[in-house]
């Protein structure tokens, strides 16, 4: 993926706490990888309307089936959202 100002959404099914933690981890990882990114923490309900405007949506692997498979955004599912290495590996696959 070209290093433009990427729009990434950290989506959480249960409130905003987890998505905010993911957002912080994703911002750190993207900076380490040399990417510029605007990262938002959103609920699943808020994310549903943004599948065609975001570049990447990252969420729990259990939620990925809820997204439109034809969406513009690349959907990234992570089993352990607190594992920074797993998040980094998952993002690296779509960048």
Swiss-Prot record:
The PTS EIIB type-2 domain is phosphorylated by phospho-EIIA on a cysteinyl residue. Then, it transfers the phosphoryl group to the sugar substrate concomitantly with the sugar uptake processed by the PTS EIIC type-2 domain. The lineage of its organism: Bacteria, Bacillati, Mycoplasmatota, Mycoplasmoidales, Mycoplasmoidaceae. Signal peptide: none annotated. GO terms for cellular component: cytoplasm. InterPro entries: PTS_EIIB-like_sf, PTS_EIIB_2, PTS_EIIB_2/3. It comes from Mycoplasma pneumoniae (strain ATCC 29342 / M129 / Subtype 1) (Mycoplasmoides pneumoniae). It is found in: Cytoplasm. Its main location: cytoplasm. This is Ascorbate-specific PTS system EIIB component. PROSITE patterns: PTS_EIIB_TYPE_2. Keywords: Cytoplasm, Kinase, Phosphoprotein, Phosphotransferase system, Transferase, Transport. One of its GO terms (biological process) is phosphoenolpyruvate-dependent sugar phosphotransferase system. It is an enzyme of class 2 (transferase). SUPFAM superfamilies: PTS system IIB component-like. Pfam families: PTS_IIB (PF02302). The active site is at 12 (phosphocysteine intermediate). GO terms for molecular function: kinase activity; protein-N(PI)-phosphohistidine-sugar phosphotransferase activity. The phosphoenolpyruvate-dependent sugar phosphotransferase system (sugar PTS), a major carbohydrate active transport system, catalyzes the phosphorylation of incoming sugar substrates concomitantly with their translocation across the cell membrane. The enzyme II UlaABC PTS system is involved in ascorbate transport. Its EC number is 2.7.1.194. It catalyses: N(pros)-phospho-L-histidyl-[protein] + L-ascorbate(out) = L-ascorbate 6-phosphate(in) + L-histidyl-[protein]. Residues 1-95 form the PTS EIIB type-2 domain. The modification Phosphocysteine is found at residue 12. It comes from the Bacteria.
